[in-house]
Amino acid sequence: HRAGRPAARHVDASDRTVIPGLWDAHTHPWQTTYGGRQTVLQLAYGITTAVSLGGFAYEQARIREAVAAGELAGPRLLATGELLDGPRVAYSMGRAHRTREGLQRTLARAEALDWDFVKTYVRAPGWVMKEAADFGHERLGVRSGSHLCTPGVQLGQDLTTHLQATQRLEFGHATSATGRAFQDVREIYTSAGFHLVATPFTALALLGADPALADDPRVTVLMPPWDTALVREQAGQPPTAAQLATLGKEMDVYRGILAGGGLIALGTDQPLVPVGLHLHLALRALHRAGLSPAEALRTATLLPARVFGADADLGTLQEGKLADLTVIDGDPFTDFATLIRTAAVLRGGVLFEQSDLVGDFGTDAGRDVKEKWLEVSRRMRREGCCDL
């Protein structure tokens, strides 16, 4: 942007609250199923940067380029290719590796496609984890991570993509069977320069505490019918004492890490959870656990920008940074629940208004067949990495 250059359009947000564009630090681009709905939903919920933590490399390159070229309405995408695994894979988006030659071919392809992150998966042996991390640092200049805080931290990785998720090593668990984390885990995330992408699936229970969220046009119009059915079902179930206790236990871990100086980037693992909406449930969970509005918001703005090495350009509202902004019809610093009332976003200075995003999609008569779409939703989420 050249100094003194007149704007072609002025946006009056004087009666709104403007914050840095939100990040979702753990997503999986799934255009083959969601079409343009996934990227539009993210914008509609105020997300201007999405971090892919696994998917098909060529498809992600296409999405990233289409967004940058203005051909696809969506957040900027930090792309990761397929999950780098050992001799077997868990998902279609994984790549199996038995030899160093095979791994080097995959990494050469990663360089050609300009990956923004390198992720190893649960059957990857130590040498795969280390060589992938080294390649990411030395050749790509990007971060690397996995599900494993140990041996991930010992092998040079930068973060874990969950607090606890699927894994194959008995000694790699970050939490106990009852969801508790202890001093050793907190020390890894606070004193070793090792970071955490938090994905609080337990926050989904909070949907039942605010059932009006299910009537939002972003749910009834933008979401595909299987997600609309899931949200409506969950909204009709007030959170139980047991669910809130489990949620509180997880939030206590995050609070301890943040209090100790650790960096937490908030993610969702969408579309395993409702796209866009779940980020707000997770933010509400953090605020409910005692974080101030500003502290909670930093986990989806400044801190992910730092975790992924993009804080020179993103994460705060400062002159000279990229114009990624979320415009809110309310003041989340006095009423945090209004954060979800996204009026518009700017991604790289390009304006997307809520009314336009919703207006581009029509309703589907088949949405009323609730049981059919609930079954579709269950099948799509079957055998995922984490319990909802």
Model-derived features: positions:
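Active-site neighborhoods of metal-dependent hydrolases
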Residues: 109-120, 124, 171-289, 362-388
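Conserved beta-strand scaffold positions in the cores of enzyme catalytic domains, especially
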Residues: 8-12, 77-79, 345, 351
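Acidic/histidine-rich helix-loop elements
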Residues: 29-33, 86-100, 166-177, 234-246
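Divalent-metal coordination cores built from histidine and acidic residues
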Residues: 13, 18, 22-25, 36-146, ...
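Histidine-rich, glycine-flanked metal-binding segment
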Residues: 1-19
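Short loop/helix-cap segments at secondary-structure boundaries that form the rim of catalytic
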Residues: 2-8, 151-157, 337-339
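Helix N-cap / loop-to-helix initiation motif
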Residues: 73, 125, 290-297
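Active-site microenvironment of metallo-dependent hydrolases
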Residues: 40-43, 262, 274-276, 284, ...
